[in-house]
Design a protein with these regions (language model features):
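Accessory nucleic-acid engagement/destabilization modules that flank
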Residues: 2-18, 24-137
Length: 137
């Protein structure tokens, strides 16, 4: 139970001016709600899932160290895209690609699809990366 309680305090954003913190849980739930509000009815649930997954990589210990002012670069956006791919690729390949693009591109824009061993910034190449520690706790 302690691990779950600790995850509730993981930081998504910190206001540089006043130090106010937004947890990953708060941020993801707010983003999911906004994604649903801006969606057509048929895609509300898919967009909710995209909102929930988009920053799941911020649960990495390395990202939390960054939020505590450690000067390190941490890839977080690709983690949610990899999860969407794993869950949706077999039953809904086209849907999986759309979700991956939305999640992976939420900071840097939507990358080219690319081919295996293609450009380093292509979606295909990014999805094959090993990401940080992916551990929590």
């Amino acid at each position: 139970m302690r691990k779950i309680e600790e995850k509730e305090n993981y930081i998504a954003h910190k206001n540089k001016e006043n130090g106010k913190i937004q947890t990953i849980k708060e941020h993801s739930e707010n983003t999911a709600r906004l994604c649903m509000e801006m969606s057509i009815p048929e895609l509300k649930e898919i967009n909710r899932i995209i909102g929930l997954l988009h920053d799941i990589g911020k649960y990495q210990n390395s990202f939390q160290r960054r939020m505590k002012d450690e000067k390190i670069r941490v890839e977080h956006s690709i983690c949610g895209a990899q999860i969407a791919k794993k869950i949706y690729e077999k039953p809904f390949l086209a849907l999986a690609y759309l979700m991956e693009y939305c999640i992976a591109g939420h900071h840097s824009g939507i990358p080219d699809g690319g081919v295996q061993n293609g450009r380093p910034d292509s979606l295909n190449t990014r999805l094959q990366r090993e990401i940080g520690d992916r551990t929590v706790g």
